[in-house]
């Protein structure tokens, strides 16, 4: 970045903003880059501003029981805020004084007042000077207030972020990511531009009092008639505003429903294409869009009337003010013109400035109160450690993620010093914890010496992660004692990658040691992966490590933990994403050898790890099921260990699958014995995978899983109203905000039966905001959210004993960020955070306007109609002016007088022109109030938006995956949310306002030109100057706005990234580093925003200067060239003043239109995306009600009796090569093999070898070369949809969209209920569906969060059965499944797909046993294609993964005598069907 010219600018340069000329010149000539932006002034740096506000806030916390954030802000910014407010007031006062001078100028032309004619020129000079003074006062004042608003936002941004890093895990558990994003986006944005309006709360009353005093002098009591009308108008507009909000609130829910489905479609676009659901999804979204547009039109019409009310009110204000006075006393022309000028100022003040100011204060105070509540939430407390301790001890520890009643009691006791409570009462409260919630850990005891390995095992939700959190201090124990040294390193269960290089992610701020670094890289098997990158370990990873596979991310996270030299290493399921071979090697080389002398606590379910551990701790439902060595486990719990070892190849399972088996085993062999499980308990067990309330609750914000991004809306339930909810003070209404929601269902179900909560699940979702649609959080994993927090909101006790010296010393004692700032490179920041640069022009091209206008032919006719009406108005005006000009004046004797004859109503020929000034200037807007022009325009523009949305949706659904893979999901979603919202809401009314203002100006200029042709000559260069200046400014401003928008996303991305890795950050003590990184992102955004504000003010000031010159010319031309006509001078000067304000408004509207049209450009860019080859011919399919569907439906050829293709499922692959992009490197090369009909083929290979890619290539989802034939039919000879319908698919990423069970199983509505129930029965889904109210009509939300992963897999299986496909592709179908659900899938595959060809990608060994052939993929090529016997006889990858003992298990029929003592997994089949269903539920 360059040094800012502002630092060396003179006072004059600062006053006129001339220091921005270099950037304006550069932006006009070439495209601006980040390096062209000026550095921010030191006073605007986030470090300085946050330090200043934090110091004042700490003082406020220390000095008062009820600290107020507004007091801290007042001490920081008040005097500058008031200084600019006074400047603003003085500038507004000049507006009130100008009409006085105008009246004196008109009076000087009075035939009876000729002595004042000589001073008219001096009055003209005074009037011009007032305009100059106003310009010099207003613009610095407005810029100064914007600047202060920006500084307040920066300071509060930083304060919120720092507080977020300090929040306790319990508080984070109760706050959704949406609320944090709302704090940073919705609320704080109000300060930036809103602060300039805040002063009008006191300026407008003073201004109205001054104006009414001046009008009183002219018109006496009748002046209040006009004021009364304005007040009524303001109230009318407020009523319209409330009506508009009502429609918008109703519409918000509909928008949300559409965006939920759209986001699910975008996230699962590969599955949508694999299922051939493009038309079904398009129809579903378009139906929701139709309902949404009905409410959009209503809101737009109300807003249209609200906007028009301002335009037409001018005439009535003047008319109502003047008419009573004229009827009673008569009036002179001077008073009419002076009143007009006063009323223009009065109208703006009462109907615009004051309501805006009140709204600004309301919004700002509400935002400050929300932030204040957030800043007082409970902070994370680090435990006191003994650095000399070498052992880890836990004695009788019990802990709750929920606050216990005893803790609430302690807080209440602190807040009420008068209340005394005995120790007996404390014991009573602590003993009643169980009444309020289940402890996540209870009565845990263990002790491990230095250098020992403790393996922690247990079922999902048993409390394994909570145990590690308690050791780290994230979870406070309610009872018991924890003892360790405090030097901890931590590896999270969900691998977390910070933005930066691989090396920075591993070192993570620790001093660099080359030998240690290389040792860790080798031990974690990262050397081979790093060598593949051109930049080696200096390759920059984006947010969430999106360039890496899951296994690579897991190994980097593990390497980070191992690299840090600590006494205690906490490893939370670090091997979950690794294949069998890699897991074995890393466990041996890293955990057992490299860390042999360190104390380690490893969360695992792998039997091999349990055998090698020094101690084993098995948890079950928060309690210690077993603690001891592995030999003791075998002796004390032989049933447990034999049961685990009885599962075929249990050691080969991933961590998640082993967890599922442990869950089942612990349930059967619990401490209570083998008592039968009641139906209620079984049902509770059924949702344990997705609804566990203890262990999983903390995941709401700290440990996100499954990257599905959705928008959601929630209506507050009574349960939420009682809970800790950030927005609990807001009325019960729908609010929109952007929030990444989760696929998991922990938080959607309260801790009661699903039956009772079923009806409330529909559309009860966390609120979400459209402002965040400009941010790039889309690629990260999503965050869980809470809906059932039921504890009271209790604030922290004030720190009354903290002195100012303590506060300051606390600031100094924190780790400084000076050395950290050197580590952060701005180019790295750009690579880490920024979205893809938009390749659209800086200024909207004429081609975009032309294309937009021609989208709908009606729009062209409407615009022509608008122009015809305007020309008719101008023509009528000119005809009447000509008629009056050629009509002889009335005889003086016919002049009318009032009854008392004291005041004459002067009627002259020129005064009659005033009537037509009103007609030309105002009649245009009066007609707009009717249905002649405005409403058809708004209506048609919304129709254009509807067409563009439909075209874009169709284009995205038909685009090839190679194109979609280059786009971020959030970027696509922004087009459907942010840009479509602009097309629906802002663009139609902005275009209407611009056309309206433009026609008013042209009409006024036409009248002036007729009255005084010389002034028309002066108008031409002004218009030319305006067009040139606008073009010059627009080129730079739009680029700056784009850079500012790109610079905003890193702030929110960094927030989400920090939250995902918060436990890791705290364990490594890297909060100061991330605060500095956050400040860097803030400073980058500030640099762009400050420059945009400065250049905008430069432009506004230049426009005003041009108009001041124009007004000077008009004034002197009219004074010097006009003869005796006071009416002519009055009309010209009044119109000139009106033209100045209106044309400036029109200029700003034109810039707004150009800015909003960029959204149209982005939409056109998506509409122009290429489509997939082999687009199928679509035919309409009549629905049951006989109506034709607007969306074409694909008919399934396999349901026909004369089924021709595919008949057998024979598949031949010849020289198949697959690439992600057309010119990219091949991912698979020269794959050739053939499959016989009905054969089962297993795909083998390491993680990332290309197994899933091969399945995608079969479906033609990639750029492919070569040929595939099914039953002799080549894929080139049929359409893409026909080809894909030949396959049934069970993808790795399960796709459940928001809709009914029926829609999810049969989106094209091809099957009857009986057929769907039959298939549901086959796959074991019937009992699941019957548990829900409405059964098949029950609406699933949040990706089917009320279903376990196994149930979702069964849904996919049911879809494949319904499709009657001949070839079935299965990509990890058993991932995350419990044994019972897995057995059901195996049984269904055998029965329903007995005659089908099955291609299986699976890590479970026993699943592969049923395959006749195996395809081994290595280094992008087929290495082997043989039977399992041949693979085991050779030195193959498959053989390496199988231990000798496992090979014995693979062939029990050959080694029956050796296997008699081994329990078989077939034992599960002995259960009755009821037991199977109950276990699944």
From Swiss-Prot:
One of its GO terms (biological process) is chloride transmembrane transport. Its EC number is 5.6.1.6. Residues 99-122, 217-222, 320-339, 880-918, 1012-1013, 1117-1130 are extracellular. Its main location: membrane. Residues 81-365, 859-1155 form the ABC transmembrane type-1 domain. The modification Phosphoserine is found at residues 549, 660, 670, 686, 700, 712, 737, 753, 768, 790, 795, 813, 1445, 1457. A lipid is attached at residues 524, 1396 (S-palmitoyl cysteine). InterPro entries: AAA+_ATPase (IPR003593), ABC1_TM_dom (IPR011527), ABC1_TM_sf (IPR036640), ABC_transporter-like_ATP-bd (IPR003439), ABC_transporter-like_CS (IPR017871), ABC_transporter_C-like (IPR050173), CFTR/ABCC7 (IPR009147), CFTR1_ATP-bd_dom1 (IPR047082). ATP 2 binds at residues 1220, 1245-1252. Residues 654-831 are annotated as: Disordered R region. It is found in: Apical cell membrane; Early endosome membrane; Cell membrane; Recycling endosome membrane. It is a multi-pass membrane protein. ATP binds at residues 458-465, 1245-1252. Pfam families: ABC_membrane, ABC_tran, CFTR_R. NCBIfam families: CFTR_protein (TIGR01271). Belongs to the ABC transporter superfamily. ABCC family. CFTR transporter (TC 3.A.1.202) subfamily. Epithelial ion channel that plays an important role in the regulation of epithelial ion and water transport and fluid homeostasis. Mediates the transport of chloride ions across the cell membrane. Possesses an intrinsic ATPase activity and utilizes ATP to gate its channel; the passive flow of anions through the channel is gated by cycles of ATP binding and hydrolysis by the ATP-binding domains. The ion channel is also permeable to HCO(3)(-); selectivity depends on the extracellular chloride concentration. Binds and hydrolyzes ATP via the two cytoplasmic ABC transporter nucleotide-binding domains. The two ATP-binding domains interact with each other, forming a head-to-tail dimer. Normal ATPase activity requires interaction between the two domains. The first ABC transporter nucleotide-binding domain has no ATPase activity by itself. This is Cystic fibrosis transmembrane conductance regulator. It comes from Macaca fascicularis (Crab-eating macaque). The gene is CFTR.
């Amino acid at each position: 970045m360059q040094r800012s010219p502002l630092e060396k600018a003179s006072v004059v340069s600062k006053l006129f903003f001339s220091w921005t000329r270099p950037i304006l010149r550069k932006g006009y000539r070439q495209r601006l880059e980040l390096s062209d932006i000026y550095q921010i002034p030191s006073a605007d740096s986030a470090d300085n501003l946050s330090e200043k506000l934090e110091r004042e806030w700490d003082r406020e916390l220390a000095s008062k029981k009820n600290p107020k954030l507004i007091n801290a802000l007042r001490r920081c910014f008040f005097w500058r805020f008031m200084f600019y407010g006074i400047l603003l007031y003085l500038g507004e006062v000049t507006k009130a004084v100008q009409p006085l001078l105008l009246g004196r100028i008109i009076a000087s032309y009075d035939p009876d007042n000729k002595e004042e004619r000589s001073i008219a020129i001096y009055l003209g000079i005074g009037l011009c000077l007032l305009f100059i003074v106003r310009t010099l006062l207003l613009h610095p004042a407005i810029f100064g207030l914007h600047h202060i608003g920006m500084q307040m936002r920066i300071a509060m941004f930083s304060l919120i972020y720092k507080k977020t890093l300090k929040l306790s895990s319990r508080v984070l558990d109760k706050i959704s990511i949406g609320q944090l994003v709302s704090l940073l986006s919705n609320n704080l944005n109000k300060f930036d531009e809103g602060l300039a309006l805040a002063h009008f709360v006191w300026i407008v009353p003073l201004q109205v009092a001054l104006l009414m005093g001046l009008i009183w002098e002219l018109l006496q009591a009748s002046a209040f008639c006009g004021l009364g009308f304005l007040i009524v108008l303001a109230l009318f507009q407020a009523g319209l505003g409330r009506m508009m909000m009502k429609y918008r609130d109703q519409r918000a829910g509909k928008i949300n429903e559409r965006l939920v489905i759209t986001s699910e479609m975008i996230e699962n676009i590969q599955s949508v294409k694999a299922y051939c659901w493009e038309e079904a999804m398009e129809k579903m979204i378009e139906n929701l869009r139709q309902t949404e547009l009905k409410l959009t039109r209503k809101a737009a019409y109300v807003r249209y009337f609200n906007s028009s009310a301002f335009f037409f009110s001018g005439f009535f204000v003047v008319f109502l003010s003047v008419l009573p006075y004229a009827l009673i006393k008569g009036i002179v022309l001077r008073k009419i013109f002076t009143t007009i000028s006063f009323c223009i100022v009065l109208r703006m003040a009462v109907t615009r400035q004051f309501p805006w100011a009140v709204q600004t204060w309301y919004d700002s105070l509400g935002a400050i109160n929300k932030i204040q509540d957030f800043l007082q939430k409970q902070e994370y407390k680090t435990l006191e450690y003994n650095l000399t301790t070498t052992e880890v001890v836990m004695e009788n520890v019990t802990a709750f993620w929920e606050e216990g009643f005893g803790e609430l009691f302690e807080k209440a006791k602190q807040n009420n010093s008068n209340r005394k409570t005995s120790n007996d009462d404390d014991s009573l409260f602590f003993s009643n914890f169980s009444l309020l919630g289940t402890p996540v850990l209870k009565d845990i005891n263990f002790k491990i010496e230095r250098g020992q390995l403790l393996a922690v095992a247990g079922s999902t939700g048993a409390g394994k992660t909570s145990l590690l959190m308690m050791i780290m201090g994230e979870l406070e124990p309610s009872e018991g004692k924890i003892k360790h040294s405090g030097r901890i390193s931590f590896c999270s269960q969900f691998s977390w990658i910070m933005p930066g290089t691989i090396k920075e992610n591993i070192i993570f701020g620790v001093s660099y040691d080359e030998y240690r670094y290389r040792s860790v890289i080798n031990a974690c098997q990262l050397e081979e992966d790093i060598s593949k990158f051109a930049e080696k370990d200096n390759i920059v990873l984006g947010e969430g490590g999106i360039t890496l596979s899951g296994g690579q991310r897991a190994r980097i996270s593990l390497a980070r933990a191992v690299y840090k030299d600590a006494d205690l290493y906490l490893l939370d399921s670090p091997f979950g994403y690794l294949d069998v071979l890699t897991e074995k090697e890393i466990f041996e080389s890293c955990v057992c050898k490299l860390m042999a002398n360190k104390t380690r606590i490893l969360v695992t379910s792998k039997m091999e790890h349990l055998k090698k551990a020094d101690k084993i701790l098995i948890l079950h439902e928060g309690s210690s099921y077993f603690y001891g060595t592995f030999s003791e486990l075998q002796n004390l719990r032989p049933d447990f260990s034999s049961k685990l070892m009885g599962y075929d190849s249990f050691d080969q399972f991933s961590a998640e699958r082993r967890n599922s088996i442990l869950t089942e085993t612990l349930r059967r062999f619990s401490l209570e014995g083998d008592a039968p499980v009641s139906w209620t308990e079984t049902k509770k067990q059924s949702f344990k995978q997705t609804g566990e309330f203890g262990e999983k609750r903390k995941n709401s914000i700290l440990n996100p899983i499954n990257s599905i991004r959705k928008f959601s809306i929630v209506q507050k339930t009574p349960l939420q109203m009682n809970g800790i909810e950030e927005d609990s003070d807001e009325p019960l209404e729908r609010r929109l905000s952007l929030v990444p929601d989760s696929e998991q269902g922990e938080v959607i179900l309260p801790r009661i039966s699903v039956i009772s909560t079923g009806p409330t699940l529909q559309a009860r979702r966390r609120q979400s905001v459209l402002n965040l649609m400009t941010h790039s959080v889309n690629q990260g994993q999503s965050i869980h959210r809470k809906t059932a927090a039921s504890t009271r909101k209790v604030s922290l006790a004030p720190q009354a004993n903290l002195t100012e010296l303590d506060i300051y010393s606390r600031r100094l004692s924190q780790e400084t960020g000076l050395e950290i700032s050197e580590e952060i490179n701005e180019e790295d920041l750009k690579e880490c955070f920024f979205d893809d640069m938009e390749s659209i022009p800086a200024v909207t091209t004429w081609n975009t306007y032309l294309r937009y206008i021609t989208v709908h032919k009606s729009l062209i006719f409407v615009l022509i109609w608008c122009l015809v009406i305007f020309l008719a108005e101008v023509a009528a005006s000119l005809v009447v002016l000509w008629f009056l000009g050629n009509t002889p004046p009335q005889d003086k004797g016919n002049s009318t007088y009032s009854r008392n004859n004291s005041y004459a109503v002067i009627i002259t020929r020129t005064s009659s022109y005033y009537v037509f000034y009103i007609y030309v200037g105002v009649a245009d807007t009066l007609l707009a109030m009717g249905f002649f022009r405005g409403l058809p325009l708004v209506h048609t523009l919304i129709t254009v938006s509807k067409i563009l949305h439909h075209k874009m949706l169709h284009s995205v659904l038909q685009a090839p995956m190679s194109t979609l893979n280059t786009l971020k999901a959030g970027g696509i979603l922004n087009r459907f949310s942010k840009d479509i919202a602009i097309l629906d809401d802002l663009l139609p009314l902005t275009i209407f306002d611009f056309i309206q203002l433009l026609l008013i100006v042209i009409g006024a200029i036409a009248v002036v030109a007729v009255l005084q042709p010389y002034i028309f000559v002066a108008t031409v260069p002004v218009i030319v100057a305006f067009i040139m200046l606008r073009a010059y400014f627009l080129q730079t401003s739009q680029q700056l706005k784009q850079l500012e928008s790109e610079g905003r996303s890193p702030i929110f991305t960094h927030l989400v990234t920090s939250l995902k890795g918060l436990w890791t950050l705290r364990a490594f003590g890297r909060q100061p580093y991330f605060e500095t990184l956050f400040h860097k992102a803030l400073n980058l955004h500030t640099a762009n925003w400050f420059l945009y504000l400065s250049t905008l003010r430069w432009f506004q000031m230049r426009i005003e200067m041009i108009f001041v010159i124009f007004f000077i010319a008009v004034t002197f031309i009219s004074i010097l060239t006009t003869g005796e006509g006071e009416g002519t001078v009055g009309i010209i000067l009044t119109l000139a003043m009106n033209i100045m304000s209106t044309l400036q408004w029109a200029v700003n509207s034109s810039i707004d239109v150009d800015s909003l049209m960029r959204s149209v450009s982005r939409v056109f860019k998506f509409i122009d995306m290429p489509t997939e080859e082999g687009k199928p011919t679509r035919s309409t399919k009549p629905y049951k009600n006989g109506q034709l569907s607007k969306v074409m439906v694909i008919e399934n050829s396999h349901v026909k009796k004369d089924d021709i293709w595919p008949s057998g499922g024979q598949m031949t692959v010849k020289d198949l090569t697959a690439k992600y992009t057309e010119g990219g490197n091949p991912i698979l090369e020269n794959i050739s093999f053939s499959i016989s009909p009905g054969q089962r083929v297993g795909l083998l290979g390491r993680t990332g070898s290309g197994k899933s890619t091969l399945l995608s290539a079969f479906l033609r989802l990639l750029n492919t070369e070569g040929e595939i034939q099914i039953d002799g039919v080549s894929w080139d000879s049929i359409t893409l949809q026909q080809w894909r319908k030949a396959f049934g698919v069970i993808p790795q990423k399960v796709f459940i969209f928001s809709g009914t069970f029926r829609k999810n199983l049969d989106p094209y509505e091809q099957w009857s209920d009986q057929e769907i129930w039959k298939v549901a029965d086959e796959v074991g889904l019937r009992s699941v569906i019957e548990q829900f109210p409405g059964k098949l009509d029950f609406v699933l939300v949040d990706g089917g969060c009320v279903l376990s992963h196994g149930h979702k897999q069964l849904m996919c299986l049911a879809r494949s059965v319904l499709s009657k496909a001949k070839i079935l592709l299965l990509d990890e179908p058993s991932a995350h499944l419990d044994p019972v659900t897995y057995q059901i899938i195996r049984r269904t595959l055998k029965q329903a797909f007995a005659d089908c060809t099955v291609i299986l990608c699976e890590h479970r060994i026993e699943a592969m046993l049923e395959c006749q052939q195996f395809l081994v993929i290595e280094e992008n090529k087929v290495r082997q294609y043989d039977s399992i016997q041949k693979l085991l006889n050779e030195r193959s990858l498959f053989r390496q993964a199988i231990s000798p003992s496992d090979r014995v298990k693979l062939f029990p029929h050959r080694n029956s005598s050796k296997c008699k003592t081994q329990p078989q997994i077939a034992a599960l089949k002995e259960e009755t069907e009821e037991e199977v269903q109950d276990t699944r539920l």
